Amino acid sequence: MTAPRTLYDKIWDDHVVDVEPDGSALLYIDRHLVHEVTSPQAFEGLRVAGRTVRAPHKTLAVVDHNVQTSDRSKGIEDPESRTQLEALAENVRDFGIEFYDALDQRQGIVHIIGPEQGFTLPGQTIVCGDSHTSTHGAFGALAHGIGTSEVEHVLATQTLIQRKAKNMRVTVDGTLPRGVSAKDIVLAIIGEIGTAGGTGHVIEYAGEAIRALSMEGRMTICNMSIEGGARAGMVAPDETTYAYVNGRPKAPKGAAFDAARRYWESLATDEGAHFDREIRLDAANLPPLVSWGTSPEDIVSILGTVPDPAQIADENKRQSKEKALAYMGLTPGTRMTDVTLDRVFIGSCTNGRIEDLRIVAKMVEGRKVHDSVSAMVVPGSGLVKAQAEAEGIDRILKDAGFDWREPGCSMCLGMNPDKLRPGERCASTSNRNFEGRQGPRGRTHLVSPAMAAAAAVAGRFVDIREWRG
């Protein structure tokens, strides 16, 4: 009789091709997502070696990082970005890979288009040259980012050399209070364990509060597993998962779907399976959260104040937090509800899905963006944009004064024209608040879509639990 296994154990075991004496394993890869930034050198390596792509049908390419989200008829002005986009178009043509270019309605952020196309499925191993590949773990898949040399290896062999990580489980029980979302859950987790807390582990998210989330909410949580230091994040597939996947363009159909579902249902963690680390949170006690520093672990309640680094005993950590406050232009003791804003960014692979945009529209309908704020909403894909427009969400947002954009990574990172100016302070639904992440000397506060929407209207952070509408 085999020992009880975790969700991660089962997927790992099902994909191991060979194990070396040193413990490293050759892992079969089911799905490979490719974008313009981390793939050019990989494709060039294939050309130099005279190799082909082993499984083009298991690879899907899209442009997202460098595409502009304003008028695309003008083309890409930045020469380096333009070169990367042109290189991807040439590479996918030469190697026979399916590709969504900037004019394809299916185009969007790689971690949004994979799930919505049904390319992402439970039980799969999924890789991409992007750290937020962990997003796909929401489907009960083993998904993680890889480097450019590994991108080349997967293209050539459909395998990857890996060492098995440890198992970690984060259980979130209880019911989320009004105004608290999946984004607040994952920020709370990172605030609890720190940005190194998941190092060397794959996290399985479990518990009543996780099960109650939509697939969009689960993707938000798994997306930021990397910010907690983990290799990947996962949620066991269930009825919510199957309902989302069923009918997607690339998902199995009919009897094939039924057979796949029977396998997916076998993936749940066995009773008594061993976890190397366990963390528990009570959802009922969570407030809306906002980041104050330059690390995703720098989290405080909306009703809290900027912490005082002088209270930190560890000298290195104290100096780090003092540096963060200086960069952010904040003073210890400042109430978060007194922090005013210049910009609001709603989008990214963390919070650029239709559920997120519906929440924002509900928050701002009949209201106006504050005079001191420039606010933009960037749908995560062309299909999300089309659905939002069909529901009238774009009209609500534009009437409120939001800039309604084309899909792409946008202001999540400073690799395209959407950037903060030096010193600007932004409420952002993205995943990283590092120095310069959204533009040189830009100041980023991580929040949920509802918190960002309310901040755009108020011109400062507010407690959305008191929001009417």
Curated annotation (Swiss-Prot):
UniProtKB keywords: 4Fe-4S, Amino-acid biosynthesis, Branched-chain amino acid biosynthesis, Iron, Iron-sulfur, Leucine biosynthesis, Lyase, Metal-binding
Any single GO BP term: L-leucine biosynthetic process
InterPro entries the record matches: 3-IsopropMal_deHydase_lsu (IPR004430), Acnase/IPM_dHydase_lsu_aba_1/3 (IPR015931), Acoase/IPM_deHydtase_lsu_aba (IPR001030), Aconitase_4Fe-4S_BS (IPR018136), Aconitase_4Fe-4S_dom (IPR036008), IPM_dehydratase_rel_enz (IPR050067), IPMI_cat (IPR033941)
Entries under Pfam families matching the protein: Aconitase
Enzyme kind, highest EC tier: lyase
Cofactor binding notes: Binds 1 [4Fe-4S] cluster per subunit.
Cofactor: [4Fe-4S] cluster
Keyword Electron transport on entry: no
Presence of the UniProt keyword Transit peptide in the record: no
Reactions catalysed, as given in the entry: (2R,3S)-3-isopropylmalate = (2S)-2-isopropylmalate
Domain of life according to the entry: Bacteria
Residues that hold [4Fe-4S] cluster according to the record: 349, 409, 412
Pathway this chain belongs to: Amino-acid biosynthesis; L-leucine biosynthesis; L-leucine from 3-methyl-2-oxobutanoate: step 2/4
EC nos: 4.2.1.33
GO MF annotation terms: 3-isopropylmalate dehydratase activity; 4 iron, 4 sulfur cluster binding; metal ion binding
HAMAP family listed in its UniProt record: LeuC_type1
Stated role: Catalyzes the isomerization between 2-isopropylmalate and 3-isopropylmalate, via the formation of 2-isopropylmaleate.
Subunit composition and interactions: Heterodimer of LeuC and LeuD.
NCBIfam families the record matches: leuC, PRK05478.1, PRK12466.1
The family this protein is said to belong to: Belongs to the aconitase/IPM isomerase family. LeuC type 1 subfamily.
Name of the protein described by the UniProt record: 3-isopropylmalate dehydratase large subunit
Organism: Methylorubrum extorquens (strain CM4 / NCIMB 13688) (Methylobacterium extorquens)
Gene this chain is encoded by: leuC
